[in-house]
Amino acid sequence: MNTNGSGYGHGTGQGNGRGLGSGGPSGAELPELPGLSGLRSANAARVLELLRVAGEGGISRLELAEGTGLTPQAVSKITARLRGSGLVAEAGYRASTGGKPRTVLRLVPPAAHAVGLHLDRDELTVVLLDLAGVLVGRRVVPLDLGAGAEAVVEAVAVEVESLLTASDPGGALSAGPLSGPLSTGRSSAGQVSARHPGCVPAQLPATPAPGPAGSVAGPGPAPWPAQPAPQPAESGPDTHTSHRVLGVGVAMPGPLDHTSGIPHRVTGFPQWDGFPLRDALAERLGLPVALDKDTNAAALGLALQTNAAALGLALQGSGDSFAYLHLGTGLGAGLVLGGGLYRGARTGAGEFGHQVVQLDGPSCGCGRRGCIEALCLEAVADGDLAGAARILGVGAANLVELLDIDRVLLGGRVVEGAAGTFVRGVGEQAPVPVELANGGPHTVAQGAAQLVLAPVFGRAEAAFSPPLPPSRTGQKIR
């Protein structure tokens, strides 16, 4: 297993603390997610990544071989498995300089999905993304993080199921292996019908029906760059497959240990300390689950955006460094250094809100006095948003001086309510560009879904819940 923090699978994320990147040794393992058991290799991830980047325009096998450095024979074997799984389909033909036209392959975004959860102190956001990272559905409901861990797990599971039902009225979304050669050998049909009599798999509609009150389901923005349209090809069996939920990414306030999936003493909610949230939710849903801090998830999602300019990132290659500062019910930071998500030696990096900037300042929930979080939230409570922005700017300037980062991105519920005030106020203090991270109100939840999606394409490492026993895999979400 790769130990530098940029590997794939059940990695620890130790070493340099970075979990973002597309590199990795040949043969490195990908997460053991439902439907991907035959593709846990760095080579398959590289092929999938090129298909993802190519978008609807597609890419030929020869171009895949040139782009990955693999032999044409290896590419043919990998793409055959991908087609059999339903993740890839033929997209037509493209003229070549000589000989017959080349067959073009494309990713099938609706073939698989990931759920992203943002557990805030008073609110739960659930999103569903397809393979291309496009928002398919979302649900926002009140949440009491202090209601007790078991009660929160059950409430979260119910909302996940509600969103999947709203986004998938045909009943096609389920947990378990995709049809085709990638099947784990355990048929899910009997389990699905046993739990849902009369349930018939169907295609996920292009425009999902709206869900119940509190939810919105609908297509996201077009994710693909403009490409020359290939000539249409005959549709084959690989274009028709049931749609699967690969896993669930969970983001919540820290501190926490993302490798074990266990929160520590969340400020104001000490009862979460030591609770095995990741594994408890995996057991309840019957899906692989990954857990990380809310700010880490947001930073990961922002760094992975295909259309970086639309989010105000303008990332230049893989070496960009930025801090994402999130001010909502608390204050924290997600750090991307040299292109890698930085978690620190003990996974605790980014506890930005608890740096002391006023020794005789107000008490903080962490037990100290004068923390920048306490000062910011006090100013917000007093209605002094400009003052809160200045305080946040002091902390941001300190962070820039310490880490020599390229830019500062702002997000969170409070910032979004007065974006201009915060961008100006922080920008007056910080010596680098300060921008609003235009991921919108669901930046954290969408980043959480990327905890599941990014490893599939070899773009990040992940620490998932242990493999579920055979009796729990391949089950329909209840």
Regions found by a protein language model. Give the residues of each.
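Conserved beta-strand edge residues that scaffold enzyme active sites
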Residues: 95-97, 296, 414
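ATP-binding/phosphotransfer module of carbohydrate and carboxylate kinases, centering on a glycine-rich
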Residues: 1-89, 99-101, 106-180, 184-185, ...
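Short loop/edge segments at beta-strand edges and connector loops
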Residues: 90-92, 291-293, 438
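Short beta-strand(s) of the beta-wing in winged-helix/HTH DNA-binding folds
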Residues: 89-90, 95, 257
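Phosphate-binding/catalytic loop of phosphoryl-transfer enzymes
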Residues: 117, 224, 240-367, 371-376, ...
